[in-house]
């Protein structure tokens, strides 16, 4: 599976007025060795946090770019879109994330292991929840998950939904899903957001 870079930061006022200010940066990175494709979107909850999801052949391809002297040029191109601190994480998901990122909205959950629990127990709980969600939420299977490169005890889970409301309803009305969410919360700390991603098309 590809390595996916998630870069998350407050969007600048310039981006919120015109998302095209981001295009020069993504167009530049789209020519980098190992780049596959990218998606971007504003978080539904706060209407101002920008999420970039860039697919790479491997994590090492992006690492090589970040360590190159050309990387400063990319940062310069990104600056007009950035309105605050940038948080970056990398993950190799359990399956192809294309379907969940092209859903009308994507749930991005950050799941951190609690003290006293094993990574394997967390992974098992996430797998069971993911499997249960996919049985009912068939339009956007498979949901995907994986540990971050930066911290093996932190997992990202991505699920595609028709809407934020559809996600809420699935948890409230699905007995299996509700129980499995409870099991996962017993061994982890979970935070999540929803992002309607768009695929980036290189400028002609």
Feature annotation, model-predicted:
Residues 1-204:
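Short S/T/G/P-rich N-terminal loop/turn motif that feeds into the first structured element of a domain
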């Amino acid at each position: 599976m590809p390595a996916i870079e998630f870069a998350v930061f407050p969007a600048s006022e310039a981006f919120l007025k015109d998302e095209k200010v981001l295009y020069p940066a993504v167009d530049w990175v789209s020519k980098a060795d190992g780049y596959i494709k990218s998606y971007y979107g504003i978080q539904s909850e706060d209407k101002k946090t920008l999420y970039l999801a860039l697919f790479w052949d491997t994590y090492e391809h992006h690492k090589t770019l970040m360590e190159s002297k050309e990387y400063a040029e990319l940062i310069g191109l990104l600056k007009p879109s950035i309105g605050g601190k940038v948080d970056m994480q990398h993950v190799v998901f359990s399956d192809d994330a294309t379907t969940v990122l092209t859903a009308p909205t994507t749930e991005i959950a950050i799941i951190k292991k609690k003290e006293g629990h094993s990574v394997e127990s967390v992974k098992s709980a996430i797998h069971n929840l993911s499997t249960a969600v996919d049985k009912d939420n068939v339009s956007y299977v498979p949901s995907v998950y994986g540990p971050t490169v930066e911290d093996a005890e932190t997992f990202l889970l991505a699920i595609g939904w028709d809407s934020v409301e559809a996600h809420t309803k699935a948890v409230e009305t699905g007995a299996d899903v509700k129980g499995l969410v409870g099991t996962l919360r017993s061994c982890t700390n979970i935070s999540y957001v929803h992002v309607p991603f768009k695929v980036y098309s290189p400028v002609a």
